[in-house]
Amino acid sequence: MELVVTSRETDKKSLLKKIRQTGGIPAVIYSGGKSVANIVVDAHVFSKFLSGLESGALSSTIFSLSYEGRIIRALVKDIQYQVTTYQVIHLDFEELIEDRDVKLNIPIRCINAVDCVGVKLGGSLRQVIRALRVVCKPKDIVPFLELDVRSLGLSQTRKLSDINIPAGLRPITPLKEVVVTVSRR
């Protein structure tokens, strides 16, 4: 996803409020744990992108931020919402550097849930873990991991170890954790 961002002044509350009122989202780009730039993201463009995004996929989405004539590849590290309207009011981006490891959550997608044996026998499919915490290089980031639940019967589970994890991803979460279960109703 490509975003054109503009520079902004530092964090005066009145300035941040004005940015939000004019259709912007205040944001910060971090690199190596240090603040690199204070920026503004177009709220309309970002909200439109969010509405089309699959649930949980934001954490593994790589953004190309067009900032002062250069492209910065980054992940959203933190997002703040307004409590009552659930509008995005602040973003933190983490710059991706090719030779540096990054920690992120990769969403887990259950496939063939409609054909699940346990569900056809009257069971209820419940996904316990929705994302896997991993460490990897930026080139190894995948948008999601798939877990096939077609053969899952009543009272059976699938663990993180049952997911085909690509070679470049190193899981932080223990692989013995249960991802999905089919229980009797």
UniProtKB/Swiss-Prot annotation:
Record has Ribosomal protein as a keyword: yes
Cross-referenced InterPro entries: Rbsml_bL25/Gln-tRNA_synth_N, Ribosomal_bL25/Gln-tRNA_synth, Ribosomal_bL25_b-dom, Ribosomal_bL25_C, Ribosomal_bL25_long, Ribosomal_L25_dom, Ribosomal_uL5_bac-type
GO cellular component: cytosolic large ribosomal subunit
Signal sequence region: none
UniProt-recorded Gene Ontology molecular function terms: 5S rRNA binding; structural constituent of ribosome
Gene Ontology process terms (BP): translation
Keywords: Ribonucleoprotein, Ribosomal protein, RNA-binding, rRNA-binding
Record family assignment: Belongs to the bacterial ribosomal protein bL25 family. CTC subfamily.
Role this protein plays: This is one of the proteins that binds to the 5S RNA in the ribosome where it forms part of the central protuberance.
Subunit structure: Part of the 50S ribosomal subunit; part of the 5S rRNA/L5/L18/L25 subcomplex. Contacts the 5S rRNA. Binds to the 5S rRNA independently of L5 and L18.
Entries under PANTHER family matching the protein: RIBOSOMAL PROTEIN L25/GLN-TRNA SYNTHETASE, ANTI-CODON-BINDING DOMAIN-CONTAINING PROTEIN, RIBOSOMAL PROTEIN L25_GLN-TRNA SYNTHETASE, ANTI-CODON-BINDING DOMAIN-CONTAINING PROTEIN
NCBIfam families: bL25_bact_ctc, PRK05618.1-4
Protein's UniProt name: Large ribosomal subunit protein bL25
Organism: Chlamydia felis (strain Fe/C-56) (Chlamydophila felis)
Taxonomy of the source species: Bacteria, Pseudomonadati, Chlamydiota, Chlamydiia, Chlamydiales
